[in-house]
């Protein structure tokens, strides 16, 4: 699975500084207490292996279809990042408005390239979105 840890503030907005404070803890007691003041969720956006089968060469659309099915059986601390198709601009604006640093736009036919950036994936942040057309997007 590919995803990222996200901490949320009291209003449910993503809070990177809070996550970084939690990440820096080393004392076991403080780490246990952090689950109360800094709950985190693992937000999943890709599935690389399933049922003993490598999926990295499968198109993103298929990997996410399988991931959505898998996520239905997972703990509440794990969330599926439900991307959007064809409404990238509105999705981007909503993501930035709710505190995300931007979005990832990914071509639905793209394979997963472990450890590498792909031209089929674009990170779109405020000030960096000119001239890009979104074919699909996921928060994160």
Kindly give the residue locations of the regions a language model identified.
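Catalytic cores of nucleic-acid ligases and guanylyltransferases
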Residues: 1-140
